[in-house]
From Swiss-Prot:
Encoding gene, per UniProt annotation: LPPG
Source organism (scientific name): Arabidopsis thaliana (Mouse-ear cress)
Record comment: activity regulation: Inhibited by Mg(2+).
Pfam families: PAP2
Gene Ontology BP terms: diacylglycerol biosynthetic process; pollen tube development
Knockout or disruption consequences: Lethal effect when homozygous, due to defect in pollen germination and pollen tube growth.
Root EC class: hydrolase
SUPFAM superfamilies hit by this protein: Acid phosphatase/Vanadium-dependent haloperoxidase (SSF48317)
Record-given protein name: Lipid phosphate phosphatase gamma
UniProtKB keywords: Acetylation, Chloroplast, Hydrolase, Membrane, Plastid, Plastid inner membrane, Transmembrane, Transmembrane helix
Residues annotated with N-acetylmethionine modification: M1
Family statement: Belongs to the PA-phosphatase related phosphoesterase family.
Location(s), subcellular: Plastid, Chloroplast inner membrane
Activity across pH: Optimum pH is 6.0-8.0.
Role played: Exhibits phosphatidate phosphatase (PAP) activity in vitro. May play a primary role as PAP in plastids.
């Protein structure tokens, strides 16, 4: 007896199609993968090389936001636009857009970090440039999901609104509720083993690390010469 093959499902976050010969669609397909690049290239690299509690909780917030998105999608069960048949994406729901929610969470949280002076900020001008970059990527990602046919306009705006709300709410939780416990996390067995730290209380952490790295190198050179 022959087995009837079942329809395969795709991972919606990385499943991107565009019309052959459509250069704009090709570009926007890559833009749609920005959340993946941020997740893997950004936060994984940050944890490996920085171990900052602010960055770790930033990443945790994005994961929580994704779970909220999936819960709402499976509860509302609003279908994607008719183009989902051509895109082979009709097996997943469309409201709200997870890509839009991810990017607007990221842009909102990042902007609030800048307003609070957390992270590597080089001055007011650079802060505006960084915020412009992140908000531009968020808007273009939202547009790409409509252009490529994965979502309706209402679905991407719903994702953007939800991402902004969840991002702002999580920022408040981290910096008002959890922040007093950062020293406890740093001094815990797991925190000391993983070398996690919090430098958000340092006004110019980039200069602080630069000066300390140079001082440490000078001390090493002096020790070798003795």
């Amino acid at each position: 007896m022959d087995l009837i093959p079942q329809q395969l499902k795709a991972v919606t976050l990385t499943h991107v199609r565009y019309r052959p010969g459509d250069q704009l669609g090709h570009f926007l397909a890559w833009i749609s993968l920005v959340p993946v690049f941020i997740s893997l290239g950004g936060f994984v690299s940050h944890f490996l090389f920085r171990r900052e509690l602010q960055g770790i909780f930033f990443g945790i917030g994005l994961v929580i936001s994704q779970f909220i998105n999936e819960f709402i999608k499976t509860s509302v069960e609003q279908a994607r636009p008719e183009t989902c048949t051509l895109l082979e994406a009709c097996d997943s729901h469309g409201w709200p857009s997870s890509h839009s929610q991810f990017m607007f969470f990221f842009a909102t949280y990042f902007s609030l970090m800048g307003c609070k002076g957390i992270g590597f900020w080089f001055g007011l001008r650079s802060r505006w440039i960084m915020n412009l970059l992140h908000w531009s990527l968020a808007v273009v990602t939202m547009y790409s999901r409509v252009y490529l046919g994965y979502h309706t306009v209402a679905q991407v705006f719903a994702g953007a609104a939800l991402g902004g709300i969840v991002g702002a709410s999580w920022f408040w939780v981290v910096n008002s509720v959890l922040y007093p416990f950062f020293p406890v996390i740093e001094e815990s067995v797991l925190g000391r083993w993983l070398y996690v730290k919090d430098t958000s209380h340092i006004p110019d952490v980039l200069k602080f690390e630069y000066d300390n790295a140079r001082a440490a190198r000078k001390d090493m050179d002096s020790a070798k010469s003795d």
